[in-house]
A protein has these predicted regions:
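Extended ligand-binding regions for polar small-molecule ligands
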Residues: 61-70, 136, 141-142, 149-150, ...
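A conserved helix-loop-strand patch within extracytoplasmic ligand-binding domains
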Residues: 73-76, 83, 101-105, 115-162
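Short helix-initiation/N-cap motifs at beta->coil->alpha
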Residues: 61, 76-87, 166-180, 212-214
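Periplasmic-binding protein-like
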Residues: 42, 118-126, 194-236, 254-262
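Extracytoplasmic small-molecule ligand-binding "clamshell" domains
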Residues: 25-100
Length: 262
């Protein structure tokens, strides 16, 4: 009798455990709750930043709004830094991450990625007087970037040991460090550099070299396969329907280029 009860308790425990760890934030849960929580950049124009009226605006914000509209649920925007994106998803603080996130094998160990929804490349940007043609020319220079970002991962691999890499907590601080000449080189996304140039036409900034082509993907927690499938259908539908192209034209000033599907 004792053995039977023991088995019953163990079986019950694992059943509850499995339900509690796999059902959280999947498609059916989002629909039943009537709300989707989506992480967006807290300060990374033009993808996500505080607008003139105090609300969050940007490419990723518009995509998040479109996701909620097509799900037919309320949207809760959760502004995050680069370092917060994956932890917030893993701990169920958000259901999706739409925050200029590139996909790589290391990140794919922790979360799932959708097909790409936005164009992006990472590069090194600096004043015209600096002769920089590749990573080796960064030797002895101060390079500013956002800690935990894709640029951080990539430049750390290829920069000479004498490069002084200065990591900042968010993109706003990184960009400010470059414009105030705290660093010699800005390592960031092309859109961030373009935004700086647009804000100040007199700013001396050039693309020195491309570090990596890195389109943006939507992050989905592992185990939420129905939600991932829905997101991929959503992206395909909005590519074909022109909605993503309209968002690209609005925020990046360019047509949506061909993007990889996963």
């Amino acid at each position: 009798m004792f053995k039977l009860n023991y088995k019953f308790l163990v079986t019950g425990f694992f059943a509850v455990f499995c339900l509690s760890t796999t059902a959280i934030a999947d498609l059916s849960d989002v629909l039943s709750l009537g709300k989707v929580k989506i992480a967006v950049p807290e300060s990374f124009s033009p993808f996500g930043s505080i607008g003139p009226e105090g609300d969050h605006v940007g490419y990723d914000v518009d995509v998040a709004k479109l996701v909620a509209k097509n799900l037919g649920v309320e949207l809760e925007l959760v502004p995050v830094s680069s370092k917060q994106r994956i932890p917030f998803l893993e701990t169920n603080r958000v259901d999706l991450v739409i925050s200029t996130m590139g996909a790589n094998p290391e990140r794919a160990k922790s979360i799932n990625f959708s097909s790409a929804y936005a164009p992006f490349f990472s590069g090194a940007f600096a004043a015209s007087k600096l002769s920089i043609k590749g990573p080796s020319d960064l030797a002895g220079l101060k390079v500013g970037l956002t800690g935990g970002s894709l640029e951080d991962l990539e430049i750390t691999k290829i920069a000479p040991k004498s490069t002084k890499i200065v990591r900042f907590g968010d993109n706003a601080a990184t960009l400010s460090a470059f414009t105030s000449k705290q660093v010699d080189v800005l390592v960031s996304g092309n859109t961030a550099a373009a935004a700086l140039s647009a804000e100040d036409p007199n700013l001396d900034i050039q693309t020195k070299f491309i570090i990596k082509e890195s389109p943006c993907f939507i992050g989905v927690k592992k185990g939420n396969e129905d939600l991932l499938r829905w997101v991929n259908v959503f992206i395909l539908h909005k590519k074909l329907g022109g909605e993503l192209n309209a968002i690209s034209q609005k925020w990046l000033g360019q047509d949506l280029p061909p993007l990889p599907s996963l």
